[in-house]
A protein has these predicted regions:
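Short amphipathic alpha-helical face segments that pack within enzyme cores
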Residues: 52, 56-60
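Charged phosphate-binding loop/patch that engages nucleotide di/tri-phosphates or the phosphate backbone
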Residues: 135-154
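RNase H-like nuclease fold core
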Residues: 2-52, 64
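RNase H catalytic domain
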Residues: 19-23, 59-134
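Terminal low-complexity, poorly structured segments
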Residues: 54, 131-134, 138
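Compositionally biased, intrinsically disordered/low-complexity regions enriched for serine, proline
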Residues: 5, 33, 133-134, 150
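Short C-terminal domain-edge/linker segments immediately following a structured domain
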Residues: 42-47, 74, 108-113, 148-152
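Short, low-complexity, polar/charged sequence segments that are solvent-exposed and flexible
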Residues: 32, 97-100, 137-140
């Protein structure tokens, strides 16, 4: 009898927050991503509409994966976010606003490269929105590269 090979799966969370209620107005905001199983939490300030920041958060996470590909090359990557719009627009035939198309196009290139899945999760379960206290105290044996994430390809 042959053994069934199961590919490891890793859950990653992305988030974007702005101060103003108007999600279409360009403003200062916070992008973040978390990989709880690895004890990774990344947060950075950025500028854009709330919807742009959601894409920028996804792109920052994908850039992190690209920079640290050896750590993720044999993993199935499940990206979870609290944005139904982002999940919808990243589906194959979705319509996207003109101002978001540049970000979406780049994210779709990454999607082909890394074969990640993108799903919705309620804000209360989005680990990228929470603080460091919610992540396990792991001694990380991997040498991750965070430095080049801010070199924005978007």
């Amino acid at each position: 009898m042959s053994k069934i090979s199961v590919q490891p799966k890793i859950k990653c969370f992305i988030s974007a927050k702005t101060l103003l209620q108007n999600k279409e107005k360009r403003q200062n905001g916070l992008i973040s991503f978390a990989i709880p199983d690895l004890g990774v939490l990344f947060k950075a300030h950025n500028f854009g509409s709330h919807y742009e920041l959601e894409y920028i958060s996804l792109l920052a996470f994908l850039r992190f994966i690209e920079l640290n590909y050896k750590a993720f090359q044999n993993q199935k990557i499940d990206v979870l976010c609290s944005s139904p719009l982002l999940v919808y627009q990243m589906s194959e035939n979705a319509v996207c606003q003109k101002e978001l198309e540049r970000h979406r196009s780049l994210a779709l290139v990454y999607k082909e490269k890394f074969k990640f899945s993108l799903s919705w999760v309620p804000e209360s379960e989005n680990r990228a929105q929470n603080g460091m206290m919610d992540l396990p105290p792991l001694k990380n044996s991997l040498d991750f590269n965070f430095e080049d994430i801010q070199k924005k390809p978007w």
